[in-house]
Amino acid sequence: MFYPDQFDVIIIGGGHAGTEAAMAAARMGRQTLLLTHNIDTLGQMSCNPAIGGIGKGHLVKEIDALGGLMAKATDLAGIQFRILNASKGPAVRATRAQADRVLYRLAVRTALENQPNLMIFQQQVEDLIVENDRVVGAVTQMGLKFRAKAVVLTVGTFLDGKIHIGLENYSGGRAGDPPSISLSQRLRELPLRVNRLKTGTPPRIDARTIDFSQLTPQLGDTPIPVFSFLGNAEQHPEQMACHITYTNEKTHEVIRNNLDRSPMYAGIIEGIGPRYCPSIEDKVMRFADRNSHQIFLEPEGLTSNEIYPNGISTSLPFDVQMQIVRSMKGLENARIIRPGYAIEYDFFDPRDLKPTLESKYIQGLFFAGQINGTTGYEEAAAQGLLAGLNAGRFANEEDGWSPRRDEAYLGVLVDDLSTLGTKEPYRMFTSRAEYRLMLREDNADLRLTETGRKLGLVDDIRWAHFSQKVEQIEKERQRLRDIWVHPHSENVSEINALLKAPLSKEANGEELLRRPEIDYRLLTSLTSFGPALTDPQSADQVEIQVKYEGYITRQQEEIEKQLRNENTLLPVDLDYQQVSGLSNEVIAKLNDHKPSSIGQASRISGITPAAISILLVWLKKQGLLRRSA
């Protein structure tokens, strides 16, 4: 039977991608349905109990700047917060938080259940309703049909998921959850390229059986950072320490002696695993010269005895897992309460997607998260927000939106996926962004919140907070520009005491702040330049904008040159066989990728500058040279 109500957008899957997608579509005013196999696992952290990190924290800040959920949920659930790369430049500084699994899930579910325009329904989806190459709904396991104008697939590792522990394996979406077999089979019938990937998780350890006195504690930062631009440290629950131990030669010997029982090394697992989060058996074999590997023992929550040993993801048999754990200092008597495992699952080639994450072949069908070949909660959540936004726009017959590479790490993410695809689980790093000085954590709201407001994602509270912050920054910078001191000023000795060389000519506050020996706090402590801003976010922004102004200006000039290519559009249905002068290799690659712009085409491996020139000349001759606004 058909459900009586029609929806604008259906989201299939309630993980990090699905929850952000559902919230985004609903915030835009679209009637949204979130279909999940289990309401109790909405927003579940399936692997490590942490949010953020290098590149990943940048994505979380961008999600927050666009009105998303992840940063706010982390502030309510975070039990340890740290700024990584704190001693380095602002472009690569990143926030990371340990999170209480239960509190995180509760924060996500509470937000979903209180979001207007959003309905949640518990049923596993087994089929899509596709008519004339357009998706129009979904069918659940009991035959209930839901109709919608757009559908977003955020099914994680559930598509034909297979769990491996040693040489044994069984079907599963993750430990304790069933796989999605019927939906996987249905999607394989569509004109989409599909492949297999693999990821893994470590065994969980009972904290009561660990001798923490032998371990090095790792504490969070003080003052405690926050993730959301609207957050404050008072929202955080009780803070906890992590601890550090190490593998050793005994650990490595256990692993080497049992490689024949590893499903990876026995050839049972076909999917490729994440390069930057390898299993412990992979680390031991790939880095044979290393005598030890650092392992972080991370608490799973305030009310749990479970410890997540970050660094020993494994699919070796349980008896070998026990030997590995007990070979390490402080864990000699440790008990495992959940075995580690590897999971293989279907993913769909993201080159078959537009930068909006809509399928090039099935109208109204959007993909987000691990189904696109990514790994990580943050990458999934960012894609989910974008897919939910664009599904909402599609349902309202509006053009899709996606950020450019110079506007957001989210732009880098979707451009990499839709242009280059991936053969291994893709994770974000700051090194993937060529304009990372512009794409800092601290300015994510300045880059994206105004756009989010225009798109209908940003509510009045966030907009008022943002507008006040922008005004504060502008006024403070103008104030510093207006205050001048000269070598004979009354208070010049106070300033000279901070400088390597005495002031030799007149200077204003911004010029003094550009000097490496002076920061904003020091400058505003001087009689002439006080008082300082009380909002630390605004104060940091003033300092960064002033100190890095020259570098930022140069990078902006580079971006403007590149934008000419980015804004030159390519027809979606163009057959590149028509373009005389292109080599067969270039024609094949362009027809395979179907790039949406000259800029995107130029980033495809093997597409030369000469080929781009030929293409531009041909477009002009044919009267097809169009540029986006």
Curated annotation (Swiss-Prot):
Any Gene Ontology CC annotation: cytosol
Protein location: Cytoplasm
Requisite cofactors: FAD
Chief site of localization: cytoplasm
Keyword Transferase found: no
Molecular function terms from GO: flavin adenine dinucleotide binding
Pfam family, one: GIDA
Origin superkingdom: Bacteria
UniProt keyword Flavoprotein present: yes
Binding site residues for NAD(+): 273-287
GO biological process terms, semicolon-separated: tRNA methylation; tRNA wobble uridine modification
Keywords, ordered alphabetically: Cytoplasm, FAD, Flavoprotein, NAD, tRNA processing
Residues bound to FAD: 13-18, 125, 180, 370
Role of this protein: NAD-binding protein involved in the addition of a carboxymethylaminomethyl (cmnm) group at the wobble position (U34) of certain tRNAs, forming tRNA-cmnm(5)s(2)U34.
Subunit architecture: Homodimer. Heterotetramer of two MnmE and two MnmG subunits.
Family: Belongs to the MnmG family.
Protein name according to UniProt: tRNA uridine 5-carboxymethylaminomethyl modification enzyme MnmG
Species per Swiss-Prot/TrEMBL record: Yersinia pseudotuberculosis serotype O:1b (strain IP 31758)
